[in-house]
Amino acid sequence: AGTGLDARDLHDEHALIWAHQEFTVIRNIVAQLGDRPGLGIEIGAHSTIGRTGVIGFMMLAGPTVREAIERAIPYLALSPTHLRFSLEEGTARGGFAYAVAADDEIPPDVRAFVVERDLAGLATAFQGAQIDLELTAIETTLGAESAELLAEAWGLESAAVVARCATNRLVIPRQRVDVRLPQADENTARLF
């Protein structure tokens, strides 16, 4: 209700669905099923890298995790995520890289659902594409219950996911971002 969408839009893979419409759909889902931790994670578990379109293709073609992420970031506005991603690196030798997923532009009433869905979806998509970041930790804006469920989605111990942080960060050993991806194709990567 109130989305401006009808059944034809939902079956048309070329239909344009705007962010405000998606947020209204999320509000309707939450109103119907209840605002409970893990609802977004359940939805994110159905993600695949193929559903991200050309961005997923760029991720698969990238020779390393770093290059795949750096190629995909400028095009994320074309993807189903509402998180703003960036890759940052610590200065300590042998330290960590951080895939930052800012959520400050998402309306507060749907933010937890979207963060859950998109971070769990990323975990599912990476697992399906055999991309192992070997995360050591996740810092998240989510509450404790959601953080624990997010740990499960990424295959981490509960203690490795810190709740109620200022932003969302996937903590990756720095050397992992330069590991060659199993499906890397340099000829395809040159196209991007």
Residue ranges and their predicted role:
Residues 45, 65, 115, 181, ...:
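Generic alpha-helical segment signature
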Residues 26, 69, 115, 119-122, ...:
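Hydrophobic alpha-helical core bundles mediating ligand binding, dimerization, or RNAP-core interactions
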Residues 1-97, 145-149:
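N-terminal low-complexity or simple alpha-helical regulatory segments
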Residues 58, 112, 178-181:
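Short, surface-exposed loop/turn motifs that are enriched in glycine and acidic residues
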